[in-house]
């Protein structure tokens, strides 16, 4: 099912691709009606939300995924299962190097991103099941390495935004729940509150300069969050720019971080 309001079109809603037909249509119709009338359904519908897909989901990708979904709809689906069909779609500059290092990739809003790294001498392929799989020990080793030493975390998946111009702080204060920073160099963590009072997202906002802010949030939910951003009228003096596709990055983490950077 692909459903929900189209972020780029005001007042335009979708509820399409219901394979089971009438067995789900009543419930999905109710959720759609609540979305239209109240601004949000009573249940979290992100798994069916059309905002999970962006401009990158072209016809070839759509055709491949639809065929795969239909062919596998009655199979047992395992936790953390990743489908290979239609991929890769988008690759970042570090992709080749990460693959060379044994990365097992997942799909995040069209991007290939490393989930974990297979040990040297083993095949970089993930197994699936309801018990501990082959990723458990490598992931455990990564966690211990970060806890006791130092490591690099690819944080390119995060959604990244620049907000600048006269009135930027006032506009952000209306969008998010927390008070945004008023001192240059300061940051704050803040939730984004939905229409029904639930948490629709969480962001880190940093003040880079006078009327200049940098905001980081979930990358896979960027198009989803656009709905909430557009609900608050933005002054013509405030410029809002998505930098998600233009910026990549790594986080240096662990007690020996300073040694690595030094």
Identify the residue ranges that each predicted region occupies.
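Short glycine-rich or small-residue beta-strand-to-loop segments that form or flank ligand, phosphate
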Residues: 14-16, 216
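Glycine/proline-enriched, intrinsically flexible loops and inter-domain linkers
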Residues: 43-262
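Glycine-rich "substrate-gating" loop/helix at the edge of Rossmann-like oxidoreductase active sites
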Residues: 18-22
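Active-site donor-binding loop signature of nucleotide-sugar glycosyltransferases
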Residues: 5, 17, 50
């Amino acid at each position: 099912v692909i459903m929900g309001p189209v972020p780029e079109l005001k007042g335009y809603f979708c509820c399409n691709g219901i394979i089971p037909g009438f067995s789900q249509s009543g419930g999905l119709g109710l959720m759609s009606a609540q979305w239209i009338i109240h601004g949000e359904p009573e249940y979290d519908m992100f798994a069916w939300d059309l905002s999970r897909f962006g401009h990158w989901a072209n016809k070839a990708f759509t055709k491949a995924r639809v065929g795969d979904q239909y062919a596998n709809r009655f199979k047992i689906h395992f936790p953390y299962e990743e489908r290979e069909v239609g991929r890769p779609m988008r690759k970042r500059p570090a992709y080749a190097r990460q693959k060379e290092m044994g990365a097992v990739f997942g799909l995040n809003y069209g991007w290939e991103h490393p989930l974990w790294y297979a040990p040297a001498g083993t095949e970089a392929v993930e197994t699936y099941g309801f018990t501990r799989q082959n990723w458990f020990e490598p992931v455990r080793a990564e966690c211990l390495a970060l806890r006791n030493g130092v490591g690099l975390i690819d944080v390119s998946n995060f959604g990244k935004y620049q907000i600048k111009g006269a009135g930027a702080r006032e506009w952000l204060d209306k969008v998010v729940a927390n008070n945004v920073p008023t001192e240059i160099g300061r940051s704050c963590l803040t939730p984004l509150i939905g229409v029904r009072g639930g948490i629709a997202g969480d962001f880190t906002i940093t003040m880079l300069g006078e009327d200049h802010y940098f905001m980081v949030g979930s990358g896979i939910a960027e198009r989803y969050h656009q709905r909430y951003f557009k609900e608050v009228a933005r002054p013509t003096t405030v410029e809002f720019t998505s930098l998600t596709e233009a910026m990549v990055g790594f986080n240096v983490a662990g007690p020996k971080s300073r040694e690595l950077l030094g």
